[in-house]
Amino acid sequence: MLSYLKKNLRSYFSSRVLIFTLAIAAIIFACATFYVISLESKNFSTIIGFLLVDLAIFLILGVLLTQKFFTQNSNNDSSKLQNRIVIAFSLVAAIPTIIVSVFSVYFFNLSVQAWFDKKISTVLDQSVIVAESYIAEHKLQLKETALAVAEDLSDMYYDLIHNPALFTKTLNTEAEMRSLDEAIVLNKSTNTIVANSYLSFSLSFATIPAHLIKKADLGEPVEVKSDPTKIRMLIKLKEYNDVYLLVGRLVDNKIIDHIDATNGAAAEYNSLKNEIDNIQIKFSIMFIFIALLLLFVAISFGVIFTAKIVKPIKKLVTATDKVKDGDLTVQVPENEVDKDEIGTLYAAFNRMIKQLSRQQRDLVIAQRAMAWSDVAKKVAHEIKNPLTPILLASERLLKKFSPEIKEKEEFENYLKMIIRHTNDIKNIVSEFVLFARLPAPKFTKSELVYLVKHIVEARKLLNDNILYKFESNVDQFDFMCDATQINQVMINLLKNAEESIEGRESGKIEVTIDAKDDFISVIVIDSGKGFPPELIGKATESYVTTSSKGMGVGLAIVKRIVEEHCGILDIANREEEGAIIDIKFDLKKLDLKVGRSGG
């Protein structure tokens, strides 16, 4: 019964009905949330509750849709491993997101209440009041001082009006006695300064607003706010005609900055306090969108991360299937993966397939060589026997009957043609025999530079139209080898190079010996026609040739001799005309082989 219920519940929760139900619920709750937010009298707790429900529904819906999507993909022969990892990423992202959302909103609400506590508001308000009281007190004192100075100057009108020097002296005395930082008497009619204290700055009526002058005409001191670092009062002198007194005191910059900072902080605090409900709602909405974004980022990251792991494995499986079907040319791209365990696996797979391919190729070549070796022995025996009498008979005919034949030149041409082709056949048979009976090398110490240079000089004498060049980075080099076989290798390579230059007025062959560390290379470069691209990969196979004079066993013999001497034969075409053949001997391996064979 329990298993039945479990099965049915699982079927229900993975069905489309639940997804459809959640989608309808998401629409309903989204509309309800919008309605609650749009009300004039907002209830923050209700709005937060609706937003949290919206978040939970969207997260669950996202997880179910993701699971449904990958379940359908798995039915389409997609990777089950990839689906499991993505679903795990989704769940791991969704559950903590819901928990963190609830606690974040709760703690944010507590923090906001702490920020806008009544005590903090009271302290800020008191600070503003104290700052304003300080300025107000200074203004009141300056106002009283302005009235007192104006009274004194009015009383001395007759003494001062015609004596500017006395006027200035009296004004300075008043300023000093009453601790004024500046005192200026201005004439409105002439727009001139009648008198001023020593530390006063020049000032004109142009800098004083007209409405303040009209206000001062009423007989009361008026504050002039022309400089934030000073408190100034303007008052009209009673006995004088259009004459005004301006007095001022400096306020400490630190006090002004402190007052400005206090007022700014209080204004900003009250502005935030008035907007707190909107801030809380905006924060909640923002957090929900961030939570949803994080969820979808986590799912996307899961898809990308899983694809990065599963895709290389899929390629490896595909390549393995091809190998199983007999394709040993398949390789997995190592440059598409990181240098981690997957990269190591790719490299190992490629090495393994290359080794299998090489072993298969070597096996085929060995089987072919063995078959041709048997054929060569029989064919050589069957052909060589009649060749000798044919050749001898042709030579005797040429000697004996040449004087008696009327068409002597034509007769000689025919016989020479027979002799030449007989020699060609004889050379082919010799190649057959050499390939079939190539003996094991007899290793002795030989001076390689002398050996190669001697062969180059000999070939140079036989080919006047070819420029030979020999270079070596060592003067001499003792080399364990079969000198006869190495001699045969060099002759074969140089003959091939000469044949590729045939038909041209001139050519060039370069032979280089390069000794470096535990390797020594012999490189032959020619300016001939090179190898056809389709044959360059199998030029060393038996009976593959581009020449009409041979059977294609020359390079096959060279390769066998080089490999017997622990070397590698590399054949390539040059970018310009010609070919390059590089023989590279591994001296360490050669020493081990010679040591084991007792050579």
Curated annotation (Swiss-Prot):
Cell membrane keyword on record: yes
Ranges where the Histidine kinase domain occurs: 378-589
Catalytic activity: ATP + protein L-histidine = ADP + protein N-phospho-L-histidine
Domain HAMP, first and last residues per copy: 307-361
Domain of life: Bacteria
Gene Ontology molecular function: any one: phosphorelay sensor kinase activity
Naturally occurring in which organism (per UniProt): Rickettsia felis (strain ATCC VR-1525 / URRWXCal2) (Rickettsia azadi)
Disulfide pairings: none
Alphabetized Pfam families for the sequence: HAMP (PF00672), HATPase_c (PF02518), HisKA (PF00512), NtrY_N (PF19312)
Class of the enzyme per the UniProt entry, highest EC level: transferase
Classification via Gene3D superfamilies: 1.10.287.130, 6.10.340.10, Histidine kinase-like ATPase, C-terminal domain (3.30.565.10)
EC code: 2.7.13.3
Protein name per its UniProtKB record: Putative sensor histidine kinase NtrY-like
Keywords, in A-Z order: ATP-binding, Cell membrane, Kinase, Membrane, Nucleotide-binding, Phosphoprotein, Transferase, Transmembrane, Transmembrane helix, Two-component regulatory system
SMART domains from the UniProt entry: HAMP (SM00304), HATPase_c (SM00387), HisKA (SM00388)
Subcellular location: Cell membrane
Modified residue annotations for Phosphohistidine: 381
Function: Member of the two-component regulatory system RF_0427/RF_0895.
Transmembrane segments: 17-37, 44-64, 85-105, 285-305
Bilayer topology term: Multi-pass membrane protein
Entry's Gene Ontology cellular component terms: plasma membrane
